[in-house]
């Protein structure tokens, strides 16, 4: 089947995270001349497809996920019965990211690779906890001395048109929970209470929206963003016993968890508080002079006639795991204007260009 037909079939699998619904087997059958390793961890299914072309040379990999978020209500059609209409294919996962997977499967099948090894790393655990997916496959590959030198993760990176954006890194994510203790009491006797809301009020303006670093050419500043704040019992005559606050920092490599801890401790000095911090993902950056960045840039410009912005915008992705294992990685895919949305769709023209970009990259790497 051709690339579009393959994508339509792939979109029919109801692969709501972490269930692959048979999609991984379907992909393995399409690339029957690749070695297939089904790697399962804690019930999560993953697939490594790999093909050796020669003994010496570079190992290029593509990464992606077949799992999707739930469709929800309000779709014009069944979210897992793809509809082709006015140049688009409508289905859950059309942009995020079965189009990317279908594109690199088609490229791997048809391109003439001159390197040593070509691999496809696929998981059904990216939209959920993302602990036993790509990370588990890379761990498996490391144990067998099979880690790739370079990788492309086919997440939907483009904003307005195919070719306008390549991700060369991602910010990390630090989650914070802050508890300010007080002493509950009657509102008519404030002198007998310790009101944590009043105590914390001067600190709030030092926390909310604060930039922990000035940013750089590649990264925006690491900003503290408050996501939840609550205290009290929902009544007007009792002061709160405590105040609970949650926040997130999308951090660049210039700001660490210890930097966040140090700043919060400084501004909360004198308060009775508890602070809990967790790094849920780590920042990374692939140098713009690296071969994978240069070659991807060349292929994108050649096929799309666009000059892509090389950036680190947006949330996190499985590319962080490649970087953690020392693999030089970039991300490139279709536009992301309808990811996780009702009536998610992908432009057929964009998808066809993506297939050509990946094919050109493989052949000229």
From Swiss-Prot:
What Pfam families does this protein map onto?
M20_dimer, Peptidase_M20
Give residues annotated as binding Zn(2+) 1. Answer: 65, 96, 155
**CDD domains, sorted:** M20_DapE_proteobac (cd03891)
Enzyme class, UniProt record, top EC level: hydrolase
| Cystine connections | none
SUPFAM superfamilies tied to this protein: Bacterial exopeptidase dimerisation domain (SSF55031), Zn-dependent exopeptidases (SSF53187)
Assembly and binders: Homodimer.
From the Swiss-Prot or TrEMBL record, give the protein name.
Succinyl-diaminopimelate desuccinylase
> To which species is this protein native?
Campylobacter jejuni subsp. jejuni serotype O:2 (strain ATCC 700819 / NCTC 11168)
């Amino acid at each position: 089947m051709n690339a579009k037909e393959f994508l339509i079939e792939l979109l029919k699998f109801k692969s709501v995270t972490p269930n692959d619904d048979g999609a991984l087997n379907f992909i393995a059958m399409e690339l029957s001349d690749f070695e297939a390793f089904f790697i399962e961890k804690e019930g999560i299914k993953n697939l490594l497809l790999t093909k050796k072309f020669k003994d010496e040379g570079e190992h290029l990999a593509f990464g992606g996920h077949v799992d999707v978020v739930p469709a929800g209500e309000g779709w014009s059609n069944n979210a897992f019965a793809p509809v082709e209409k006015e140049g688009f294919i409508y289905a859950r996962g059309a942009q995020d990211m079965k189009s990317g997977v279908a594109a690199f499967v088609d490229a791997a099948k048809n391109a003439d690779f001159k390197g040593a090894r070509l691999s496809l790393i696929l998981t059904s655990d990216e939209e959920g906890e993302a602990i036993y997916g790509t990370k588990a496959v890379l761990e498996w590959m490391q144990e067998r001395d099979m880690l790739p030198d370079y990788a492309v993760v086919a997440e939907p990176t483009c904003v307005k048109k195919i070719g306008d954006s390549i991700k060369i890194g991602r910010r990390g994510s630090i989650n914070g929970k802050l508890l300010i203790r007080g002493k509950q009491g009657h509102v008519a006797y404030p002198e007998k209470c310790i009101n944590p809301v009043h105590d914390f009020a001067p600190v709030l303006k030092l926390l909310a929206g604060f930039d922990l670093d000035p940013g750089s050419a590649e990264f925006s500043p690491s900003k503290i963003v408050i996501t939840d704040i609550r205290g009290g019992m929902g009544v007007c005559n009792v002061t709160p016993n405590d105040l609970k606050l949650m926040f997130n920092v999308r951090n660049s490599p210039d700001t660490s968890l210890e930097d966040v801890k140090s700043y919060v401790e400084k501004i909360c000095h004198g308060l009775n508080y508890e602070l809990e911090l967790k790094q849920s993902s780590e920042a990374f950056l692939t140098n713009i002079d690296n071969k994978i960045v240069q070659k991807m840039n060349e292929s994108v410009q050649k096929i799309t006639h666009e000059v892509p912005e090389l950036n680190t915008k947006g949330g996190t992705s499985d590319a962080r795991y490649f970087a953690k294992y020392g693999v030089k990685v970039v991300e490139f895919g279709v536009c992301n204007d309808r990811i996780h949305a009702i009536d998610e769709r992908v432009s057929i023209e964009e998808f066809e260009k993506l297939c050509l970009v990946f094919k050109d990259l493989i052949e000229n790497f």
